C-alpha cells in the first residue's frame, strides 16, 4: 500500500493545511482530505504542485507500507 507523507513533511516545515493550500494552489478541501487520509488516491498533477510547494521531489511524498494481510 502507498501512504502519502505530505502531512509529515509539511508539519516538519511548520506548514499547516491552509498555508500549503495557498502555496501549492490546491483546493483546501483536497489538502484536508490528504491530511486526514494519507492512503487516498491523488492526481499526479496535484502531487507535483504539492511537492514543488514543499521543496521536495514527488517521490519524497510517499512511502510503501506493507498491507496488513502481508504481515
Regions found by a protein language model. Give the residues of each.
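DNA major-groove recognition helix of helix-turn-helix
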Residues: 10, 24, 35, 46, ...
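Short alpha-helical DNA-recognition segment
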Residues: 15-33
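Helix-turn-helix DNA-binding elements, focusing on the entry/boundary residues of the two helices
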Residues: 17, 44-47
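The alpha-helix within a helix-turn-helix
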Residues: 10, 21, 51
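A short, Lys/Arg-rich alpha-helix, primarily the initiator
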Residues: 1-16
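Short, charged recognition helix plus adjacent turn
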Residues: 8, 33, 62-71
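Residue cluster at the C-terminal edge of the helix-turn-helix DNA-binding motif
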Residues: 23, 41, 52-53
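Hydrophobic micro-packing sites on short alpha-helices
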Residues: 46-51, 61-62
Amino acid at each position: 500500500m502507498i501512504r502519502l507523507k505530505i502531512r509529515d513533511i509539511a508539519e516538519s516545515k511548520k506548514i499547516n493545511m491552509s498555508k500549503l493550500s495557498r502555496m501549492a494552489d490546491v483546493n483546501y478541501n483536497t489538502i484536508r482530505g490528504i491530511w486526514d487520509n494519507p492512503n487516498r488516491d491523488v492526481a499526479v498533477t496535484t502531487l507535483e504542485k504539492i511537492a514543488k510547494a514543499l521543496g521536495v521531489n514527488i517521490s519524497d511524498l510517499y512511502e510503501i507500507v506493507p498491507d496488513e494481510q502481508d504481515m
